[in-house]
Design a protein with these regions (language model features):
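Beta-strand/loop substructures that line and gate deep hydrophobic ligand-binding cavities in soluble
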Residues: 155-200
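Conserved short hydrophobic interaction patches
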Residues: 94, 98, 102, 156, ...
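Hydrophobic-ligand binding "helix-grip"
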Residues: 129-170
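Beta-strand secondary-structure signal
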Residues: 76-78, 127, 149, 163-165, ...
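Hydrophobic/basic alpha-helical segments enriched in Actinobacteria
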Residues: 107-110, 150, 208
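A conserved amphipathic terminal alpha-helix motif
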Residues: 187-233
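Hydrophobic ligand-binding cavity/cleft-lining segments
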Residues: 2-129, 236-239
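Short, flexible segments with low predicted structural confidence
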Residues: 62-67, 137-138, 177, 181
């Protein structure tokens, strides 16, 4: 099971950041997809915390928002796909068979480190491998025909959850990625909330994921990508 690195190891990992940032920045500068971005500040956590995971899910090492640092960011990335050759359940089934079909594998790849079978299932664990210090261990905590949800584990830069869903829509499919997370520690909070570097890396990763999901569907993206961010200041309870 993954463990949280010691603080000294986290700072040593920072020495590898330039390589990771260079790779992501090159792609980021040449994006042509239309982005609709909105960020607002919410006064309370009501409606902005992740769903509870089922009782049967092992909660060992799961990082809850109360375990994090700084504000909670509730983000939703969404796009509409026209002319999809796959229904919403079919598209999600295809994705669950291999998450790397949609991952921007130039700089991010899902590696399953625990679990069996030909497709994603509850209890499976992955590490999202990225250049620099961005590797993130996660566990599947929810799974149905049109969605799945991941919770961050000890050692991840964030404390929270992220859900991927495909929704049937008139004439196509709407694909959404919704996350509820705080920074995992003070260093992560500095990079995400204050310097905003990690925040832009994250945005580039998930918008690239949506582009590749669209290609996987055989359809075309219409209206670009909408990114809605709600910043919630808390309180969130005591750290574990």
């Amino acid at each position: 099971m993954p463990r949280r690195p010691k603080p000294a190891a986290r700072w040593l990992l920072a020495l590898t950041w330039p390589t990771g940032i260079a790779l992501t920045s090159w792609d980021y500068m040449w994006r042509t997809t239309v982005m609709h971005r909105r960020e607002t500040i919410e006064p309370a956590e009501t409606g902005h915390l992740p769903p509870d995971h089922p009782d049967e899910v092992d909660d060992t090492e799961i990082q809850l928002p109360r375990d994090g640092v700084g504000p909670l960011f509730h983000r939703r990335y969404s796009t509409r796909i026209r002319g999809s050759e796959l229904s919403a359940p079919e598209l999600m089934g295809r994705l669950k068979a291999d998450l790397n079909q949609a991952a921007p594998t130039k700089f991010a790849r899902f590696q399953r480190v625990f679990g069996e079978g030909s497709r994603l299932g509850i209890g499976d664990e992955y590490v999202v491998r990225m250049p620099g210090p961005w590797d993130g261990p996660v566990r599947v905590v929810a799974d149905d025909a049109c969605s799945f949800r991941l919770a961050t584990l000890s050692g991840h830069l964030e404390a929270g959850q992220i859900e991927f869903r495909a929704l049937p829509a008139d004439g196509g499919v709407v694909f959404e990625i919704e996350s509820w997370a705080r920074s995992g520690d003070r260093l992560s909070n500095l990079l995400y909330h204050h310097v905003r570097m990690a925040k832009e890396v994250q945005l580039h990763m998930w918008t690239s994921f949506l582009e590749r999901v669209t290609a996987l569907s055989g359809g075309r993206m219409t209206g670009g990508i909408t990114i809605d961010t709600r910043r919630v200041e808390g309180p969130f309870g005591a750290r574990a």
